[in-house]
Design a protein with these regions (language model features):
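N-terminal extracellular ligand-recognition/capping segment immediately after the signal peptide
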Residues: 29-40, 48-75, 79-93, 125
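Extracellular beta-strand/beta-solenoid scaffold signature
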Residues: 36-40, 65-67, 90-111, 131-145, ...
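Boundary at the C-terminal end of the N-terminal hydrophobic targeting segment
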Residues: 19-22
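Extracellular/surface-exposed low-complexity segments
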Residues: 525-530, 546-557
Length: 557
């Protein structure tokens, strides 16, 4: 035993090239002097073949005042999150000791050819309490790991407040496990997130954690192409499951601070145009999002022209939007999906639940709440999900609120809906974007329940194909389905149950354009039960330009 200790002590005094690979256990209780300086000195003698165990082996609070960088495999551990606390301090220059001058406190930097293993567990880390916003305009990180594998972060608490700083930044790291952690970032400013993963990666498991965020920037983000890899970036076997996410004002900032995008999966506009990302087996499931502050988009999924994807599933998640005090108008979207790749592989949303208790009012006074926004011609399969919007009025507007279930940008897109239940609707779909929609919009709906204002609004759109079969419409208005139509398109409306207050029409025509300009290449309305519709003539009254028509077997009550 004595010989083993002596060998370790000797190895710390030699350069890595002078000794064989070693395992070094560094007990913080045995270090003297400034902790940051001592850790730097010990780490400087270890290389990629070595393994360092940094053990905070006594209960208490320890301070790190500068960057500690490891070029070896490292395990950082304590006695438990309630017994071991590491405080990150901005530091000051004194006696030749450099304070925090880099962009991160703990850094592990490896290469793609020789990744390093990292384990962090059983301790708490927090930024020192302070006034004002630290590092405004110069983003920092508590932990930055580059080209590391495997990475295990478990039973770990990390809290940052009032700083442009991100808790954990993983760059081109694989075989990553983040589990049973509580990660908090109340940056109270424009920049800084909680857990960011960049570049090429595989076998990622982020499960059973609790995330707290307030301020702009993503809580959890997959993005970037930071690893110099040949060809396209590859990401596969990504799982984010059974986590609790809170967007809540518990910092010192204003209550009306807006978060842009809370959770994202993308590559990013800074990636070279010649580089794409091949994603497969991406599972975002069983998570709970409690949104207690202003946020533009809760979850954004984005694929560029060169990106490919397969088996991307967002399932069994729960979203709850809570009321927000104040009088700020805002546009809010639960999910935004962008897919610019021509392959058009569907992205699956299944079994998700959304409950809205917030009054989202757009700057122009209408409802500012959208459930799913489709960009770039994406295809979305939306099944077995539910939405309940409980807010119909607000002191900020005289207009009635309600959720806009679907929206599309100028490239159009396809949404396939099966077995869903949506209530409190302000509009079933808005097919209206800027100067017009050039791409084709397709909505296929089977066995859904739509409750509220169930209109599909079309404006300046070239082509729309609608296929609604076996659905239930509990409409609060007589305009229960179409408000205007595309320049051309088709409508199949079969086997639906429609309940309206009276004088129901399949399409209403309110704008100044000639209604004959709306061309139904195919109009099929069969075997529906209409309550509150006087008959076929009233039902189809504004529809005059039909190429192929089949209307039969309908019941009017």
């Amino acid at each position: 035993m004595l010989l083993s200790v002596m060998c370790v002590a000797v190895s710390l005094l030699l350069l890595p090239s002078q000794v064989a690979a070693s395992t070094v256990t560094l007990r913080v209780s045995q270090l003297q002097g400034n902790l940051t300086a001592a850790l730097r000195e010990r780490a400087a003698h270890l290389g990629p073949a070595d393994h360092l165990v940094l053990y905070f082996d006594r209960a208490g609070t320890f301070t790190i005042e500068g960057t500690v960088e490891f070029a070896c495999n490292v395990e950082i551990k304590g006695l438990g999150v309630k017994k071991t606390t590491v405080v990150l301090d901005n530091g000051t220059d004194r006696a030749g000791f450099k304070a925090f001058f880099d962009d991160t406190f703990f850094k592990v930097s490896a290469s793609t050819s020789q990744p390093l293993a990292v384990s962090i567990h059983d301790l708490s880390v927090k930024l020192k309490d302070h006034n004002g916003i630290w590092w405004d305009g110069a983003e920092k990180y508590a932990f930055k790991l580059c080209n590391c594998a495997p990475v295990s972060i478990e039973r770990f608490n990390c809290t940052l407040r009032n700083a442009v700083c991100t808790n954990v930044d993983l760059r081109a790291c694989s075989n990553v496990t983040v589990r049973n952690c509580t990660l908090t970032n109340y940056n109270n400013c424009t920049t800084g997130g909680v857990l960011w993963l960049r570049g090429q990666m595989h076998d990622i498991d982020i499960s059973a954690n609790t995330f707290y965020k307030y301020g702009n920037d993503e809580c959890v983000a997959f993005f970037g192409a930071d690893a110099p890899v040949p060809g396209d970036i590859k990401r596969y076997n990504i799982k984010v499951a059974n986590n609790d996410f809170y967007y809540v004002n518990r910092g010192n900032g204003p209550a009306d601070l807006v978060n842009g995008v809370f959770f994202t999966y993308y590559v990013g506009t800074s990636t070279p145009a010649t580089v794409g990302c091949a994603s497969s087996n991406v599972d975002i499931s069983g998570n709970r999002f409690y949104m207690q502050g202003l946020c533009h988009t809760i979850m954004g999924i984005t694929f560029s022209e060169r990106d490919t994807h397969d088996n991307v599933v967002i399932a069994n998640n729960y979203i709850e939007n809570s009321p927000v005090a104040g009088d700020q108008k805002i546009r809010h979207c639960d999910y935004e999906v962008t897919d610019l790749n021509a392959a058009r592989i569907p992205i699956t949303f299944s079994g998700n639940t959304t409950v809205n208790n917030a009054a989202f009012v757009a700057p122009w006074g209408a409802s500012g709440y959208c459930h799913l926004m489709v960009h770039g011609g994406a295809i979305v399969d939306l099944g077995k999900s539910s939405l309940t919007d409980n807010v119909a009025t607000s002191s900020l507007t005289t207009q009635r609120l309600g959720c806009r279930l679907l929206s599309f940008d100028n490239a159009g897109g396809t949404v396939n809906m099966t077995g869903n239940s949506f209530s409190g609707l302000g509009m079933l779909a808005s097919i209206d974007y800027g100067d017009g929609i050039d791409g084709k919009v397709t909505i296929n709906a089977d066995s859904n329940v739509f409750t509220g204002d169930t209109r599909i609004y079309c404006r300046n759109v070239k082509t729309v194909d609608l296929n609604f079969v076996g659905n239930t419409f509990n409409s609060t208005t007589s305009n229960f389905f179409l408000q205007e139509f595309a320049q051309q398109g088709s409508l199949v409306f079969d086997g639906n149950m429609v309940n309206t207050p009276g004088n129901g029409q399949l399409m209403t025509h309110w704008d100044n354009n000639d209604k004959a300009a709306r061309r139904f290449n195919k109009l099929q309305v069969r075997n529906n039960v209409f309550t509150g519709v006087d008959g076929e003539r009233t039902l189809l009254q504004p529809i005059t330009n039909v190429r192929s028509r089949s209307v039969a077997g309908n019941v009017y009550r």
